[in-house]
Structure formats: structure tokens, C-alpha cells
């Protein structure tokens, strides 16, 4: 994250002896980009390197839909099966070397495994459900409309209080956009959200012994390891790198007399993509405004939108839970009669919630996307 935070008990100085109840605590530097990036210091009851058993390695190559035409896509996640596990069995739909977009439907209950994504930061957008996120940093309660942002390398698990549907983004260097931060890391006036909107982890320490199964994910697969001490044995931590949650309903959308580009709603930025959030807001209010998106030839980008709730005015035939992929080089925009209908909406409010991922690198669609794809969608501007 962008500001300093601390939880639990800490020594007065870093890298010094820290005793608790007569026992030496084990300090871990949890950091990005070697020793030059953001980091936190965690203090464990036990060495975090302690592995009791090395388990199974399972490869995990995303199957590509190799004969897919280069066209727009509409995917209906309502047709997807349930995931047996949110980490091992999430369903990858759209991907490239630096981005994976997945969806997961998970039943109520506790996950039996602990997770650690070694290669990618993760964003879980909670389309529906209630979840208790548990990690080495502590716990965060998340619910419908929340983003849960997890730095790569974080050890965590999830407890589902209700059946849940999750739109999942994996990528490198997912951060709060630099334009929102001043030189001290504080979110500036006019940014899409403020520091106090973020839900931060509350530390809970587990001093327990047993058999704990941890799955480490890389781009190539999953490695299972077994531990004899609980991985959440942290008694205190501080720093600038930790998970957090943010509700889309706490966002502060920028509106204008004339239509604002999607980048006005940038929520997170990564190496090769941005995440934008369309939330309920005032439509454009110039007396001659066209309060709907213009036609767009996004030559250098691929645009993925997840439609969560409300009415997305520029689209027809879109249901909650649908995903569209608008290809770079193909023009996209409002469907027939949508522009005319929007003219009566000047100065009124919309109720849409949608998540947009725009990437600068071409994406592939998976074999799972093929199963839920609407092949008529590219023609919908002609046939609507």
C-alpha cells in the first residue's frame, strides 16, 4: 500500500533481538523488487522457513482457445460450473503473460488449504457473497462490492460466510495509481478514493501446532508443502506492503459537463494494465452533451469489462455477471439506438457497477471461455 501501517507487538528497533515470553521472535522481511521496493517486517513465533514435508507438484497451463477468431467476445459467467477450490480451481478466461482474469463460484464454508501466489498480485472483486480473509497480516471482512487486494507472496486463506462469486485479476505490480499520491504517499485531493476508505487487516495470532497444507502458485503450477506450525503465527508487523480492501460504493467518481474517458475511473494500476471502476454517478450535464460513451478504436489496448450490477446504458443484452472483451483494432461503442436514448438522461443518475481491465498487450481467450461465449456478440451492433 502507499502508507505506513503497524499491528501487534514490535521491537523498538528493526533487526534487533525481540523476546516474547522468553522466546526469540523470528523477523521476516516481506518485500518487492529485492531490497529496493515496498516492504513490511513481520515477527513470527516460529521460523517461517520451517517445512515439514514437500508435497505434490501440479502443473497448471491455461488451455488456449487456439482457433478463436480475432473479434469481440461476450462471456456469460452464469453458465460456469462451481469451483471446487478458489485457488486451485478458479476458471481462467482471459490471459496474457502479465495478466490472468478468472472467475470462481464458491460454496459457503472454510477453505481447507493455505495459499500463496508467488508470481502475481491478486485482486478479488466480490460480485456476491461474504468472506473473511485471513492472512499473516491479519483478517479483513469483505462483502459484495468489495475489492480485496493481495500482494504476491502473501500467505492467506478464505472463509466463505455465504456462497460467493468472484471476479479475479492476477498481475504484476498492482498499486494505487501514482497520480493519486503525493510525494509522501498520501492520497491527494481529487483522487478516486482516500486513505480512510481502505479496510486494513486486523492482526490475529495463531500459536498452534498441527498439519497445515500450503499451496504455492507459480505461472507454471502449484507446489504443495506441509507445515507443523500455523502459518499465521505473526505477533506483530509494520511497513508499507500489506493486503487491503476497498468498496466500490466508497469511490468518489469524477463527473463533468461532457463525457469523461474510462481512465477518469482508474482504481488500480499495474505494469501493463489498469483497473477502472464504473459506479453510480451523475450523467453528463452540458445542455448538448451526449451522456454515453463515444465509439472507440482502442488500437493499442484490449478492454475487458465485468458487469456486476445496474443498467449499463451503452449495452443491450448484457446480464449481471457477463464479461465483454473488446479487441484492439476493432471499433466498439454504443449499440444501435443507445445514443439517441441517452439524450434524455442528461443530468440524471445511473446505477451501474462494472469493472474494466484495459491492457496494453494482446490477450488470449481460454478453452473455458469458448464454452460460455456468445458468437453473435460481434454482430450485435448490426442486428440490435
From Swiss-Prot:
Its EC number is 1.13.-.-. Fe cation binds at residues 296, 302, 332. Keywords: Dioxygenase, Iron, Metal-binding, Oxidoreductase. It is an enzyme of class 1 (oxidoreductase). GO terms for molecular function: homogentisate 1,2-dioxygenase activity; metal ion binding. Its cofactor is Fe cation. One of its GO terms (biological process) is L-phenylalanine catabolic process. Belongs to the homogentisate dioxygenase family. This is Putative dioxygenase SSO1533. It comes from Saccharolobus solfataricus (strain ATCC 35092 / DSM 1617 / JCM 11322 / P2).
